[in-house]
């Protein structure tokens, strides 16, 4: 496994572990480098009926992050079919941020990109957890 895939897998396992610790049901579904033809996000997490999908990218520096058109459209379709909300998880040195996938812009070539400035404005893991928890519907009975 090359260092980029190894680093990405390590970040994915870290996110899965942290979300599990926060009460999520989580699976890691890495497809990078596999013979899978369908595109699925790296992480699928559920909590009380709320579904989040996370595509993870890891970089050593602040370069732009690109996602190929076919992959981006495939995981967007997966999100649509599942009813989940799609995020890009970006790991940079000393920073892990989550950005709504809709924040990516499409390039002239049809691929998708996000710059460091937008990544820096993303949510930290705790913010993502609070975001999901704010979407959990609670009935009056749950307070009794």
UniProtKB/Swiss-Prot annotation:
Description of how activity is regulated: Cleavage stimulated by PCNA123 and PCNA323 and by RadC2.
Site annotation Transition state stabilizer: residues: 57
UniProt function note: A structure-specific endonuclease that resolves Holliday junction (HJ) intermediates during genetic recombination. Cleaves 4-way DNA junctions introducing paired nicks in opposing strands, leaving a 5'-terminal phosphate and a 3'-terminal hydroxyl group that are subsequently ligated to produce recombinant products. Inhibits the helicase activity of Hel308 (Hjm).
GO MF term (any one): magnesium ion binding
Cofactors required: Mg(2+)
Keyword terms of this UniProt record: DNA damage, DNA recombination, DNA repair, DNA-binding, Endonuclease, Hydrolase, Magnesium, Metal-binding, Nuclease
Pfam families according to UniProt: Hjc
EC number: 3.1.21.10
SUPFAM superfamilies linked to this entry: Restriction endonuclease-like
Gene: hjc
Active site: 32
Positions bound to Mg(2+): 12, 42, 55
Catalysis: reaction(s): Endonucleolytic cleavage at a junction such as a reciprocal single-stranded crossover between two homologous DNA duplexes (Holliday junction)
Entry similarity comment: Belongs to the Holliday junction resolvase Hjc family.
Cofactor annotation comment: Binds 1 Mg(2+) ion per subunit.
Keyword Acetylation: no
Subunit structure: Homodimer; forms a 2:1 complex with Hel308 (Hjm). May form a complex with Holliday junction DNA, Hjc and Hjm.
Principal EC category: hydrolase
Name of this chain's protein: Crossover junction endodeoxyribonuclease Hjc
């Amino acid at each position: 496994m090359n260092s980029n895939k190894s680093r990405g897998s390590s970040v994915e396992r870290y996110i899965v572990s942290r979300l599990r610790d926060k009460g999520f049901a989580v699976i890691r579904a890495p497809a990078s480098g596999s013979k899978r033809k369908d595109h699925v996000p790296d992480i699928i997490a559920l909590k009380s009926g709320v579904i989040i999908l996370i595509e993870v990218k890891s970089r050593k520096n602040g370069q732009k992050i690109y996602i190929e058109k076919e992959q981006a459209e495939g995981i967007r379709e997966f999100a649509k079919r599942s009813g989940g909300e799609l995020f890009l998880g970006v790991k940079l040195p000393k920073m892990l941020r989550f950005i709504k996938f809709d924040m990516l812009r499409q390039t002239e070539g049809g691929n998708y990109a996000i710059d460091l400035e937008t990544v820096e404005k993303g949510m930290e893991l705790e913010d993502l957890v609070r975001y999901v928890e704010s979407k959990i519907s609670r009935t009056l009975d749950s307070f009794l």
